[in-house]
């Protein structure tokens, strides 16, 4: 509510009501369409989407919830929230670091609940984001090597060809000279990051 009030004060014309309650399917569909139009407007204008207040209003509580779920190994609960958060962040082209962390969290959660094919699909998306952008590799450099080790294992579980993953692993290890034994587990790395962010 405080975030909504702040947005109303800062941006003239921001919707004045937060509606909660039990609604019919038609009402929910209409509201979803309205939200889609609103997000398209936000994306087009640009200014609003870059404010901390808007970020808090839109996805701060979801990020906090999934962080808590990850720390408590409640992977089933985290999966749908992470999927929705990723779609939202990606559609807004917002906070690349958060998108990469969200995808990595989603991949490990899907794997933990045995949804290996879904984990593979999102892992492929995550790898593509790293490989197509030097900026992303720089932003997510602490996650990249643990992600590759994770993917090597996941590809093996699914019987996928691991040659490309292993070539990327070899290339990524050269500057660090790390073996698998010295590379942090992706889940442990994500949990450490959450703990560090909580301290600041």
Which role fits each region the language model picked out?
Residues 2-200:
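Intrinsically disordered, low-complexity regulatory regions
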């Amino acid at each position: 509510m405080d975030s909504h009030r702040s947005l109303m004060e800062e941006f003239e014309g921001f919707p004045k009501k937060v509606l909660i309650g039990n609604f019919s399917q038609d009402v929910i569909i209409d509201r979803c369409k309205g939200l889609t139009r609103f997000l398209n407007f936000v994306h087009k204008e640009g200014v609003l989407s870059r404010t901390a207040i808007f970020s808090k209003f839109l996805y701060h509580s979801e990020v906090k919830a999934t962080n808590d779920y990850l720390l408590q190994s409640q992977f089933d609960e985290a999966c749908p929230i992470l999927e929705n958060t990723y779609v939202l962040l990606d559609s807004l082209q917002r906070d690349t670091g958060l998108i990469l962390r969200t995808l990595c969290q989603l991949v490990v959660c899907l794997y933990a609940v045995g949804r290996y094919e879904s984990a593979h699909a999102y892992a492929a998306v995550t790898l593509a984001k790293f490989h197509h952008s030097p900026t992303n590799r720089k932003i997510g450099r602490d996650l990249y090597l643990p992600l590759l080790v994770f993917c090597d294992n996941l590809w093996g579980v699914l019987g996928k060809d691991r040659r490309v993953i292993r070539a990327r692993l070899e290339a990524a290890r050269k500057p660090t000279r790390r073996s698998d034994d010295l590379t942090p587990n992706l889940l442990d790395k994500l949990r450490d990051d959450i703990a560090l962010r909580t301290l600041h």
